[in-house]
A protein has these predicted regions:
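ATP-binding N-terminal substructure of ATP-dependent carboxylate-amine bond-forming enzymes
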Residues: 1-106, 137, 369-390
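A conserved helix-loop-beta module that forms one wall/lid of the active-site cleft
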Residues: 94-163
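Conserved ATP-binding module of the ATP-grasp superfamily
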Residues: 126-129, 145, 149-152, 161-196, ...
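Short beta-strand-to-turn element immediately C-terminal to the catalytic PLP-Schiff-base lysine
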Residues: 133, 163-168, 200-202, 231, ...
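ATP-dependent carboxylate/phosphate-activation module, predominantly the ATP-grasp catalytic core
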Residues: 188-253, 257, 264, 276-304, ...
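Conserved protein kinase catalytic/activation segment
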Residues: 268-270
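Peripheral (often C-terminal) accessory segments that flank ATP-dependent C-N-forming ligase machineries
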Residues: 299-391
Length: 391
C-alpha cells in the first residue's frame, strides 16, 4: 500500500503515525517544505521516500510530487495529513489522482460551518442559529433576530483563529470595518460546558474507538489570555454518544479520526458546535494513549492498512492537560511543579508557538483515577503568585 503523508514533520508528533504505517508494511511517502536533514531521525527512518517542495501551498509542486511517487512506486492508495489546515489540499489531490476519501465534492460539508449546520439540521441535532454575512445590513439583520452577544468566526477556519465575541453595536461596527476578506458566519452565543465526542472510524464506517474531552473554559477565553485546562473523561454520557454516533453516520465518516464539539447547555441538553475530520489538537492523541493504555497511532495505521482495528477502551484513568503561558507570574516554577505533582505527571513539554494562544507555551499532562485530585493539581500548576489566582 502506497500512502502519501503531507507535512509529516508538523505537528511534531505526526511522525508516529508514519512510523506505525511503516511497521505494518506500508510504503510511506512524505511531502513537505522542510529539508530532509531537518526531519527527526525516527521520521526519516519511517519514510520510504521524501519529496521536498518549495512551499506546501504550491499546488502544482504537490501534483509533481505525487506524479513522481506514482512513477516510482505505482498508484497512490491513500493521502493524509491528519491536519485541519491541509484538509482541502488533500481533498483536491484525492480528486485529481482518484484516491479514496474526502474529495473536492465532499470536503465542503466538513470545512464550511454553514454547511455543517445543514447536516446538523438534517440529522435532527440542535445547533446555534447562524448565518453567513457578507454585508453590514445582513449582519445587523441577524443580530436583530438573535440579540447580543454573537460570535463571529470564519466560515472556513481552524480553531479559534480570527474568532470574535461581539457584545454590543460598537463591537459589531468595529468587526465589520476590520474583518478580513473572507466569508464570516455570525452565530448566537451558546452557553454551558464545552465538551467533545471523539473517535476513530474504520473503512466501513464502524466506530472502533471513542473518547470525550471536557474543557475547563471556552477556547476563546484561552486565546484571550486565560490558561487552558481540559481532561479526558472516563465515561461518555449516553446522550452524547448517541448524538455523536448519529453525526458520524450523517457525515459519512470513514477511515479517519474525528473530533465533534458540543455545548452541554444549562438545561442539560446538547447543542452541536462544529465537526472536525481529524483528531483533536495538541497532544490529545498521547492523552488518549495514557488514559486507555493503548497505541492510537497503531490503531489508525491498522485502519488504513487493514481496514479496521480493535481498541480496548476501558478508560481506567482520567487524563488532564494543564497549560501555562509565557510571561505569567506563576506561584510554582517548573521545578516546583515537578517536585509537588511529579507523582501525577506522565509528561510535560514546551509547545510550538502556533499552539500557545489556545493551550499554552508549556503543557503538563496528569493521569489518575481521581478527577478531583487531578483538577486540584491542575489548579496548582496554573496558580498565579498574585491574588488573581487561575486566569
Amino acid at each position: 500500500m502506497n500512502v502519501v503523508f503531507l507535512s509529516p514533520n508538523f505537528p511534531p508528533s505526526l511522525y508516529l503515525f508514519c512510523a506505525r504505517l511503516r511497521e505494518l508494511g506500508a510504503t510511506v511517502l512524505g511531502v513537505a517544505d522542510a529539508s530532509y536533514e531537518s526531519l527527526r531521525p525516527e521520521l526519516r527512518e519511517a519514510l520510504t521516500e521524501y519529496y521536498r517542495v518549495p512551499d506546501l501551498h504550491d499546488y502544482d509542486a504537490l501534483v509533481r510530487a505525487l506524479g513522481h511517487f506514482t512513477h516510482r512506486h505505482g498508484k497512490i492508495d491513500r493521502i493524509d495529513s491528519l491536519n485541519e489546515y491541509w484538509l482541502e489540499t488533500e481533498a483536491r489531490l484525492r480528486t485529481d489522482f482518484n484516491i479514496p476519501g474526502l474529495n473536492a465534492e465532499t470536503i465542503g460539508r466538513v470545512k464550511r460551518k454553514s454547511a455543517m449546520k445543514r447536516v446538523f439540521d438534517r440529522a435532527g441535532v440542535p445547533t446555534a442559529r447562524g448565518r453567513v454575512v457578507r454585508s453590514a445590513p445582513a449582519a445587523r439583520e441577524f443580530v436583530e433576530e438573535v440579540g447580543f452577544p454573537v460570535i463571529a468566526k470564519p466560515d472556513v477556519g481552524v480553531g479559534a483563529a480570527r474568532t470574535y465575541r461581539l457584545e454590543n453595536d460598537d463591537d459589531l461596527t468595529a468587526f465589520l470595518a476590520g474583518r478580513a476578506r473572507m466569508d464570516y458566519i455570525l452565530e448566537e452565543e451558546l452557553t454551558g460546558e464545552l465538551l467533545s465526542f471523539d473517535g476513530l472510524v474504520d473503512r466501513k464506517g464502524h466506530i472502533v474507538f471513542t473518547s470525550s474531552l471536557v474543557y475547563g473554559l471556552p477556547v476563546l477565553d484561552a486565546v484571550r489570555g486565560a490558561d487552558m485546562w481540559y481532561w479526558i473523561d472516563r465515561e461518555i454520557a449516553p446522550d452524547l454518544a448517541e448524538v455523536g454516533e448519529r453525526l458520524v453516520r450523517a457525515f459519512d465518516v470513514r477511515e479517519r479520526p474525528f473530533h465533534f464539539e458540543f455545548f452541554r447547555r444549562p438545561d442539560g441538553s446538547l447543542a452541536a458546535l462544529e465537526v472536525n475530520m481529524r483528531q483533536p489538537g495538541g497532544l490529545t492523541v498521547d492523552m488518549w494513549n495514557w488514559a486507555n493504555d493503548i497505541d492510537f497511532y497503531r490503531a489508525w495505521a491498522e485502519v488504513v492498512v487493514k481496514g479496521t482495528t480493535t481498541v480496548h477502551t476501558d478508560r481506567p484513568y482520567y487524563c488532564v492537560w494543564a497549560g501555562r503561558k509565557a510571561g505569567k507570574p506563576y506561584r510554582l516554577d517548573h521545578q516546583g511543579v515537578l517536585d509537588r505533582f511529579g507523582a501525577l505527571l506522565v509528561h510535560h513539554e514546551r509547545m510550538d508557538d502556533v499552539f500557545a494562544p489556545a493551550i499554552g507555551n508549556y503543557g503538563y499532562i496528569l493521569r489518575g483515577p481521581d478527577l478531583a485530585l487531578l483538577a486540584t493539581a491542575a489548579a496548582g500548576i496554573q496558580e498565579l503568585a498574585t491574588p488573581a489566582g487561575r486566569q
